[in-house]
Amino acid sequence: MHRWTVFNEEINGNLVRVRPVGSVCHGIEFDEMACASVKSSTHNSLWRISEPGALQATNWESEHGFGSCVIDSSKDTPCRQGRIPYYAVMAQTPQHIQTAIQFARHHNLRVAIRNTGHDAIGRSSGRGSLQINVSGLKGIHFLDDFIPQGGYESQGQAVTVGAGVLGIELLTASRIQGVNVVTGTCSSVAATGGYLQGGGTSMLGPAYGMASDNALEFHVITAMGDTIVVNQYQNTDLFWSLRGGGGGTFGVVVNTTIRTFPDVPAVHFLLSSTIHRDTETSLDAEQSLWEITAEIAKLLPDLKRFNNATSSIIVPIRMEDRVTVTAEILLVNTSDIHSAGTYFTRLIKTLDSQGFPYTSNLTLYPQLSTYLSQQRVLDRAGYGIIEGSVLVSEDLFFHPDGISDIMLVLSSLQLEVGDSVEIFMCAGGQVKANKGRVTTALLPTWREAVLLLTIRRTLPPSSMIQRMRNSQLPRLRSLESPYLGSYLNVADPDEPDFRKAFWGDHYSRLYQIKHDRDPNGLFIVRIGVGSEDWDMDGICQFSKMQ
């Protein structure tokens, strides 16, 4: 313990002993008031960010064969550590991270880099690891004329963002500044971090490109414990790999400078439909779910032709007593609400003619930032979730039968209670235009894609998990040939060939950079670059890539 005590002193008392958040509800650690507080907070995403012993998806807190600590299980059920690290460095400065890396290297400890805990394939935790928690690095600094270190050419307006800054925090600050930035759709996902390093999908993707396309500079602490600047002029191998190569793999990113864009007008359409099973109606709930979804999806190619910067997200969900469909469509850099409205009027007439219930709203935002800075999706944390995703090409999307073919596959998936599908039009437009203009580690087929299809399941009995992996995801992957690949931030943790699915032809270069920059494997994450050389826990190295 003396070594840990000295280490804690070296990082100004920011080392904490970590137990799963459910520990206060079990055994000798039981505390009635604390347990009640945990239970009332468990689905709050911001609370989970603040707790180093919690993740957003609870299945990654547990470890098969090494136990779990489920909040709602019996008081007498033992609380096991699972995949939650025993210690966490709650970093407040880059120096704390440097010291932590040096300590981990000296004592041969596995490191888990943890920010908001949103990772859905288990990269933010690890059995027996030392957690480096960067959620406290909160700086935001806007720049009118950014020149990367070592360079001479201005990149225009930008903002330098600390690793722990949430998307909603950056968007709120950007609105005050009169600019926009590319961030994720969930308010509590970090604005940079693993989100950006994994590529970074966004409702602004078609207008401005992927989040990773807009990264201009990183400050990184390497596996050797060195603090370096990474941009197009220096450490160019890492500048390439950090933009799409995946989070938690190449170093600890302390801050990232990203491009900002002038505030512009936008038109936003929102539609929501709910059909209950227990009401007297002639509508079949499941059939109606897909018919409504299909009618919305049919609009997308025409909207894309009307405004190439259009994005959308359609989410059909099956619940125990009802089905719901929610759709958001965003047309960026236009104030022509009347022309846009003609498309939505067509949709409304179709839904009315078929007797579907819905609510809808069409809004002109003089400033896009007003829409972006609205807080969303903060109360869906604290569940076990698995998911998988598939890219859909522009060729299939614009084919006369393309949307029908997509909907035929989606409607055949036989959703279970709690399942959802996400049809995300987040590519095309500037994502496509950046092909050849922006050189990054991003999966190359993103430049050919328009849609990202995701199936998401709250954890049910194991047989249902296997059906998703053995039947539903293969159906999505067979939608077109060749298979374009998957988005590594919204991925099946058992993706059959993750190297090809996440990075395609870029993988061999990524693997070499990983080997050069982290030869001892300090930063190993599940199905990340170089992980094939290690066991699933990233503890035992057993092979080398041939």
From Swiss-Prot:
Quote the PROSITE patterns the UniProt record gives.
FAD_PCMH
What is one Pfam family matched by this protein?
A: BBE
Q: What GO molecular-function term can you cite, just one?
A: FAD binding
- The catalytic activity of this protein is classed by the Enzyme Commission as 1.-.-.-
The FAD-binding PCMH-type domain sits at 81-263
Q: Which UniProt keywords apply?
A: Oxidoreductase
Q: What job does the chain carry out?
A: Nonribosomal peptide synthetase that mediates the biosynthesis of usterphenyllins and uscandidusins, p-terphenyl derivatives. The function of ucdF within the pathway still remains to be determined. The pathway begin with the biosynthesis of 4-hydroxyphenylpyruvate (HPPA) from L-tyrosine, possibly by the aminotransferase ucdG. The nonribosomal peptide synthetase ucdA then condenses two HPPA units to produce atromentin.
UniProt name for this protein:
Flavin-dependent oxygenase ucdF
Please state the gene responsible for encoding this protein.
ucdF
